[in-house]
From Swiss-Prot:
Top-level division of the source organism's lineage: Bacteria
Chief subcellular location: membrane
Bilayer topology: Lipid-anchor
Role according to the record: Involved in pilus assembly.
UniProt KW keywords: Cell outer membrane, Conjugation, Lipoprotein, Membrane, Palmitate, Plasmid, Signal
Protein name per Swiss-Prot or TrEMBL: TraK lipoprotein
Span of the signal peptide: 1-16
Lipid-bearing positions (S-diacylglycerol cysteine): C17
Gene giving rise to this polypeptide: traK
Gene Ontology cellular component annotations, sorted alphabetically: cell outer membrane
Lipidation (N-palmitoyl cysteine): C17
Species assigned in the record: Escherichia coli (strain K12)
């Protein structure tokens, strides 16, 4: 992928994203992790537990002490694990993209849990990497925005849960990340931006620039945000930005 000058892309982008838990079930627990890192996670020792790595597939489960009574891979790339242990133990998850995630399981009675292990996938995934490096830089940014808008992500790109993504908004504006899409070297984040003041504020895409930013897009053409109004701001970042 050839890096030219950073670019601001204009366009009307309309996206929607929703997450819903079925009645009577626990909502998924999102656990941020880094490759090679470890997390202490409470799991059920009376019901099965589901582990997933959004944007990746778990291909192996390793438990040296045999504490897992069962582990079964799902068609979607997750793994269902079960234990009757009462004491903490450790197991390792290996993924298709080359991640190794260490889980310090803390067993307890209760409903089975759904755990989403969210790791920064940038720098992994051969399919996304090949496409990103072979596409001219400006065309790459435009194609990513159009693909997400159309609901069909580029090859090797995935939507992942929000973790620590932030946006440095100008004075008077608040911002909250509500959706993330990631590839190999780049990721795209959607922020809900709101005018908290009692008057209209002038806004430009460049107002939302920060280290690692490669493109900023408004959900609709705008030069002002009215008092109390909200709009979506889409930011494409490289490996330097969160």
């Amino acid at each position: 992928m050839r890096k030219n000058n950073t670019a601001i892309i204009f366009g009307s982008l309309f996206f929607s994203c929703s997450v819903m838990a079925a009645n009577g079930t626990l909502a998924p627990t999102v656990v941020p992790m880094v490759n090679g890192g470890q997390a202490s996670i409470a799991i059920s020792n009376t019901s099965p537990n589901l582990f997933t790595v959004p944007g990746d597939r778990i291909i192996a489960v390793n438990s040296l002490d045999g504490a897992l009574t069962n582990n079964e891979q799902t068609a979607s790339g997750g793994v269902v694990v079960a234990t009757v242990n009462k004491k903490p133990f450790t197991f390792i998850l290996e993924t298709e993209r080359g991640l190794n995630l260490s889980i310090q399981a803390v067993p307890r009675e209760g409903a089975g849990r759904t755990i989403q292990l969210v790791s920064d996938l940038r720098g992994t995934g051969e399919e996304a990497g090949a496409w990103e490096t072979s596409t001219p830089y400006e065309s790459l940014l435009v194609t990513i925005s159009q693909a997400v808008r159309g609901g069909k992500l580029p090859a090797g790109w995935y939507q992942v849960p929000v973790t620590k993504e932030t946006l440095q908004a100008p004075a008077g504006l608040s911002s909250v990340a509500d959706a993330v899409w990631t590839g190999n070297h780049l990721k795209m984040v959607r922020f809900a931006v709101e005018n908290k003041t009692l008057s209209a504020l002038n806004i430009r895409e460049s107002d939302f620039w920060q280290p690692g930013t490669r493109a900023v897009m408004f959900s609709q053409p705008a030069s002002q945000l009215l008092a109390g109004a909200r709009m979506d701001v889409y930011v494409i970042r490289d490996g330097e930005g969160n």
